[in-house]
Amino acid sequence: MEPNRIEVERTDGGVAVIALTGEHDLYTAPAISDRINGVLEDGTALVIDLTQSTFIDSSVLRVLLEGRREAHERVVGFAVALGEDGFPGVRRMLEVTGLIGVFPVLPARKDALRQAASGDGGS
C-alpha cells in the first residue's frame, strides 16, 4: 500500500498541483489545507490531484470546498483531477455529496491543468 503523501508541484504553465496519495482524513486535512492556502496566497491556479488517493473523508471534502471558495474569491483557477479509473470510493464520495457539480472534476490531470489555467474554478 502506498504511504499517505501530500506533494506540491509547480508547473511551467503557472499552475500548482497538490497531489494526494493514499488515504486522507481528519489527521491529514490540516496539512492539505496549509498547502492549499500557501498556493492560493501566491495567486496561483490550483489542481488537486486525487488520481492516487484511495480514500478521503468529510474533513478533506471541507478543505477542498474552502480551497475552491478561496480560489473563486482570488479569481484564480481551481480544478480536481480524479483519474479515468479513479478509486471508486473517492469518486463515490464526490458524487454522493454533490461536489462533482460544485467544482470542476476532470478525468485526467492534463485536463484539470488546462481548466485551472483558464482561470475557471467553478461557480
Positions of PLM-derived features:
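STAS-like cytosolic regulatory interaction modules
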Residues: 1-52, 66-123
